[in-house]
Amino acid sequence: MATKFPKFSQDLAQDPTTRRIWYGIATAHDFESHDGMTEENLYQKIFASHFGHLAIIFLWVSGNLFHVAWQGNFEQWSQDPLHVRPIAHAIWDPHFGQGAIDAFTQAGASSPVNVAYSGVYHWWYTIGMRTNGDLYQGSIFLLILSALFLFAGWLHLQPKFRPSLSWFKNAESRLNHHLAGLFGFSSLAWTGHLVHVAIPEARGQHVGWDNFLSTLPHPAGLAPFFTGNWSVYAENPDTASHAFGTAEGAGTAILTFLGGFHPQTEALWLTDIAHHHLAIAVIFIIAGHMYRTNFGIGHSIKEILEAHKPPAGGLGAGHKGLYETLNNSLHFQLALALASLGVVTSLVAQHMYSMPPYAFIAKDYTTMAALYTHHQYIATFIMCGAFAHGAIFLIRDYDPEANKNNVLARVLEHKEAIISHLSWVSLFLGFHTLGLYVHNDVVVAFGTPEKQILIEPVFAQFVQAASGKALYGFNVLLANADSAATAASLGTYLPNWLDAINSGKTALFLPIGPGDFLVHHAIALGLHTTTLILVKGALDARGSKLMPDKKDFGYSFPCDGPGRGGTCDISAWDAFYLAVFWALNTVGWVTFYWHWKNLTVWQGNVAQFNESSTYLMGWLRDYLWLNSSQLINGYNPFGTNNLSVWSWMFLFGHLIWATGFMFLISWRGYWQELIETIVWAHQRTPLANIVGWKDKPVALSIVQARVVGLAHFTVGYFLTYAAFLIASTAGKFG
């Protein structure tokens, strides 16, 4: 007899109902719970899967390069990045009638194509690619790399090549290699590419495989490096009149600290970027030699942690016990990694638009909007995952004995204070912000907009002024020509930075007013409420006053029956489930704010945001409704245009989103009865009754229905907004 899915759990494989399939999918990646799993095998499986993950990423990027080289217009775009629309790939669709074929034959193509809004053209252009041949070479290189990583993943699953558990637990060696090897060395390699290939290309000199060993990236060669005369590499930078991609106005510097932006491309100076990566490389390569391995020199992380113990004893045992706890818990490690990655992804979103690194990308408004929204959404999900795995750590891996009176134990002991403070902050922010919005909404509706309560964000304006914004008249730090901060920075990044921040042409520290003040506090409400739910879920995961033995029930459980009233909805998984709704709510407000404010800046119509963003109807009417009109007209009685694909996606996103509620607002018994009626009808219908099934159909469990509902809600939510965002921006700016 063939073994049934799932092979990793004999219990589930023998389940006679459709529960087998659902629970099989739900626990497929929960390796710890699989039959016969040992700790060593667990680490080996996860390690091997990393190679597969990298192979998929390289294959994906290889596909991007290949399709742009084959079907795109990279060479034409490179000649005129500001006016040619970049093509992602061709569309072959047998459903297209003549109207659709005409509508999607765009961007200078001779047949239907998709326009690229990912920014890859700008990236490849900035790093020195100019021809389709360059793209094909990159594609083939990544394809080979992908195959190598797949082989490495397979190899590390073979008995002879499986690392031992002690190898995985050797934290110091891993840190050294990851810091120096992965971060440090790769940053150094990237600096090398920028200096040897990208910067010469930006100055009109092509460097390829044929001449890169004979072309000096700097006229002085390596002499200044070996003589310690490093400042030579910063002398003679590109001038303000430099035409990117040509020798006109170009300098010879390779490592600079000019500050501000290249006047023509409105992107960071390539020589500044190279300098930044070199600095990162040096720091991380040094950091990768800090930790003690079998040579007996350097820091021991365990000793460092155990030394973190305030002498007066006011904070208990400090960090004692953390080394073993962290080193023995994959969930703890994953939670910290996800928290860090979530923060850095959100920072990427903020910096991509305020300090664009790629040439001419600042003028491709749809791409800027897409990249901001994309990174902010991803950051949202990753941060939620950090708390989910933090909660799983506390349930499965936390040992109260090993952590007696240390920082972890003390956080758990005063969790009530933490949770109640978060609750108070959320209530305060929610009632005050909503109160202001509703008040303003009412007085505007009654025709007396002058009665609005409008609060200037003076503290935020002060922070902007400290960074050099002169608009507000605060005489502080960089906004004061005579301050110590200004004097200290004058020789390096200052004049250029001040020009950029005050020019009105960049997205650096946009002017802010009462509308920004209100939406900032709405976002703060969303962030604090999401955090409250996630923190409470994790801190109560092991037990609460209501259910002291909660940890024995695992990460997700529906209820402990009617005998213990009120134990439904209190598992750590339920907290994660609820938090994702709040997180989506918050990222919605963040992206609405960013998009509307920037739309008005790009259109030269900032007054619209300033006047309409202070009351609710302004957001609904002047942002959502007004900007959806072009999108909704993608199809109309007169035919179709190139927004129709987004129009369709907008409708489809709403459908998926609404379907989510069918799973979220439902009760098991109803579905069970319905299923049994359908089965009855099926068995009595000719033809239909020829097909039978081995699994007895049963309704989804409470937790399953929630995860299916949440998945539909989430996917529908961001498909709807993605279509709105891209169509409303592209409809205005192409």
UniProtKB/Swiss-Prot annotation:
**Amino-acid positions noted as binding chlorophyll a B3 in the UniProt annotation, renumbered to this chain:** M662, Y670
Places the protein is found: Cellular thylakoid membrane
The enzyme's E.C. designation: 1.97.1.12
The free-text cofactor remark is: PSI electron transfer chain: 5 chlorophyll a, 1 chlorophyll a', 2 phylloquinones and 3 4Fe-4S clusters. PSI core antenna: 90 chlorophyll a, 22 carotenoids, 3 phospholipids and 1 galactolipid. P700 is a chlorophyll a/chlorophyll a' dimer, A0 is one or more chlorophyll a, A1 is one or both phylloquinones and FX is a shared 4Fe-4S iron-sulfur center.
User: What is one cellular component GO term in this UniProt entry?
Assistant: plasma membrane-derived thylakoid membrane
Positions that bind phylloquinone: W671
Ranges annotated as spanning the membrane: 46-69, 135-158, 175-199, 273-291, 330-353, 369-395, 417-439, 517-535, 575-596, 643-665, 707-727
Q: List ligand-binding residues for chlorophyll a B1.
A: H654
Q: Which domain of life is it from?
A: Bacteria
In its keyword annotation, does this UniProt entry include Iron? yes
Keyword flag Glycosyltransferase: no
- Which transformation does this protein catalyse, written as a reaction? reduced [plastocyanin] + hnu + oxidized [2Fe-2S]-[ferredoxin] = oxidized [plastocyanin] + reduced [2Fe-2S]-[ferredoxin]
Keyword terms: 4Fe-4S, Chlorophyll, Chromophore, Electron transport, Iron, Iron-sulfur, Magnesium, Membrane, Metal-binding, Oxidoreductase, Photosynthesis, Photosystem I, Thylakoid, Transmembrane, Transmembrane helix, Transport
Q: Name one GO biological process term.
A: photosynthesis
Q: Where is the signal peptide?
A: none
Q: Which family does it belong to?
A: Belongs to the PsaA/PsaB family.
What quaternary structure, including any partners, is listed in this protein's UniProt entry?
The PsaA/B heterodimer binds the P700 chlorophyll special pair and subsequent electron acceptors. PSI consists of a core antenna complex that captures photons, and an electron transfer chain that converts photonic excitation into a charge separation. The cyanobacterial PSI reaction center is composed of one copy each of PsaA,B,C,D,E,F,I,J,K,L,M and X, and forms trimeric complexes.
UniProt name for this protein: Photosystem I P700 chlorophyll a apoprotein A2
Origin organism is Synechococcus elongatus (strain ATCC 33912 / PCC 7942 / FACHB-805) (Anacystis nidulans R2)
- Tell me what gene encodes this: psaB
